[in-house]
Every structure is written in structure tokens, then in C-alpha cells.
């Protein structure tokens, strides 16, 4: 679970990178569909599933909006993300393993876009936070 130190590190990092959330989301989602092409199946209803396409950009923005929500609900991710968990479990039917895949892509993008801010301490705290988000999103699958 997240310590107070982890929570503070995530909040501090988000305060520096949050204004770039749309770009992070686009790059992370674009990276995911290239590196893990099987994830494209969730977006087969889109006319264009290429990196940086309008649909990828829009969904990347939506994903990072969810991350911003999670930062604001960091003290109780399970309750704070319940609605998103229900949506992903019952409506979208996303395999929860994909949350971990996207988390990895988000970490890679943040590390390349913000090398100074992405210290080893920030890395471990953000990784733990994103793992907590994935766990909270998977809650309704049980």
C-alpha cells in the first residue's frame, strides 16, 4: 500500500506533470498499441487505431483524466475509482491485465518526458500508485 511518503511523492510529481497529461496519455496509449498490438482489439470500433490518431489522443486524455481523479482520491482508491471499475468490468469488459500494460507505458512516457522529475524515488512511488489504481479498477471483476 501507499505510504504517506509515496502519496506526497505522487502528488508532487503530478503537480509538475499534470499540465502535460494529454500528451502523456496520447504517447502512452500510442506506445501501448504498438508494443502490445493485441490491445488494439478493444478499439476495433474506431476507424483509425494508429499512434497519435484523433481517437487515440481523445482516449489518452480520458485515461489521464482517470489518473488525475485517482491522484485526488489517493487516500481511498478503491472507493474513489468504483465507478470507473464498474464501467471497465461491466460495460467495456477490459481484461484487467491491460491496466498493468498501460501503467508500464505511462511510466516509460513520464520517464522520457520528465527525466529530472522522474527520480528513482518518484519512480517507485508512481509505480506503487499505478499498481494501486490497477487494483482498484479490477475491484468489480471479483
UniProtKB/Swiss-Prot annotation:
It comes from the Eukaryota. One of its GO terms (cellular component) is hemoglobin complex. O2 binds at residue 59. Keywords: Acetylation, Heme, Iron, Metal-binding, Oxygen transport, Transport. GO terms for molecular function: haptoglobin binding; heme binding; iron ion binding; organic acid binding; oxygen binding; oxygen carrier activity; peroxidase activity. InterPro entries: Globin, Globin-like_sf, Globin/Proto, Hemoglobin_a-typ, Hemoglobin_oxygen_transport, Hemoglobin_pi. Residues 1-142 form the Globin domain. The modification N-acetylserine is found at residue 1. GO terms for biological process: hydrogen peroxide catabolic process; oxygen transport. Heme b binds at residue 88. Red blood cells. Involved in oxygen transport from gills to the various peripheral tissues. Hb1 is a heterotetramer of two alpha chains and two beta chains. HbC is a heterotetramer of two alpha chains and two beta-C chains. This fish has three hemoglobins: Hb1 (major) and two minor hemoglobins (about 1-2% of the total). Hb1 has a strong alkaline Bohr effect, and at low pH exhibits the reduced ligand affinity and cooperativity that comprise the Root effect. Belongs to the globin family. This is Hemoglobin subunit alpha. It comes from Trematomus bernacchii (Emerald rockcod). The lineage of its organism: Eukaryota, Metazoa, Chordata, Craniata, Vertebrata.
